[in-house]
Amino acid sequence: MASVRDDEFLRLAAASGCKAFFVGLESVSQASLNGTHKGHNRVGDYRQLLERFHAHGIALQAGILFGFDEDDQDIFARTVDGMGDIGLDNATISLMVPYPGTPAFAKLSAEHRIIDFDWRHYNGKTHVVYRPKKMSPDELMAGYEWAKTQFYSPRQIVKRLAISRTGLWWNVPRNLGYMFGLTSEMRARAAMHRVEKDEPSFGVVERIDQSQGIEGNKGTEGNIGIEGIR
């Protein structure tokens, strides 16, 4: 992928009709990024990165993950405030997932921190499948839910887009779509939990051999971000 630091690349992208980029920023914690070998993402450069996109009329959708070993309970408010302060247009917010076959899964398995072997739950949205290091699974889930609803709250939408001012005619409806979509997501999750109570054995993985994992899923970590945004 061409570097997002290349202004000529961004100029050509905008001229082609590109409206938005997805970039795996992953976290506002440099310690969390360094701990997962993603130190090429520099938190101190996020504002400049956004300004470069916005100068070309391109919005930025960031991938944000919660649940890294260096994340504590402050990470949720820090993320919402930090992304609001720099005018991030949108975010796809998820839970860190240690997919079988990755070093993340092997590490957590060796530390006896995998608590859920039901494959349906490895979706980054509905369940915490391991024990986080600096909070409980319930605290991680609650913080994740809070951060999503806060990021897409009317106050935060106004704050972020007042800074961005990029494609407001489509960026405002896009944010509102996410805001209203959270209600549907919560209903779907509640329905999923009800089904699981009725059919507890469906889809359960009895045991996953961490030394073999699952072929075709050999990433460096459970989730993959963009390379080189300095």
Feature names for model-found ranges:
Residues 1-169, 193-209, 230:
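A structural motif corresponding to the C-terminal lobe/cap of the Radical SAM core domain
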Residues 171-200:
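Short, amphipathic C-terminal "tail helix"
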Residues 213-228:
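Small-residue-biased low-complexity repeat regions
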